[in-house]
Regions:
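Membrane-interface extramembranous regions
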Residues: 2-144
Length: 144
């Protein structure tokens, strides 16, 4: 009987360790996916001045009655997304980066709902926000 109990304990320890490792890998995957997504959007769309990006930010600039010019709006959002991506890549600041990603994606989603309309960028923002929220939920006990 005692060997069966030891085997059961050994199995449970192993499975807990495996679950822990699986969670760590999932958290790393989420951080990498969100960071790569934000860096791609910043570097290849906003900083490069792709036609679609310029058109979206021109529309947003007109929506706020020209208070923020299109280049400042586009490059500023690209810079912010770059900072958030870097924060997500650093383990000690990943929760801050995820929180900022949630706030930023909320603004992006609202701008798509009220001004820009729905499309691939809207779906992308939803996915980034969902992943950032999942990251925050999975790491909430670590922050206490």
């Amino acid at each position: 009987m005692s060997t069966t109990i030891r085997e059961a304990l050994a199995c449970s320890r192993w499975s807990r360790g495996q679950d822990f490792m699986g969670k760590r890998l999932a958290l790393l995957a989420i951080r990498l996916l969100v960071s790569v997504n934000l860096l791609y959007a910043a570097i290849f769309l906003k900083f490069a001045g792709v036609t679609d990006s310029v058109a979206l930010f021109t529309q947003m600039s007109q929506a706020v009655h020209g208070l923020v010019s299109q280049p400042v709006f586009r490059l500023g959002s690209g810079a912010f997304e770059t900072v958030v991506a870097v924060l997500l890549l650093i383990p000690k600041t990943a929760r801050l980066g995820a929180g900022l990603a949630v706030v930023w994606m909320t603004a992006v989603i609202l701008s798509h709902i009220f001004v820009l309309g729905y499309g691939w960028y809207f779906v992308d923002a939803l996915m980034v926000m969902l992943l950032a929220v999942i990251y925050l939920l999975l790491t909430r006990r670590q922050s206490h």
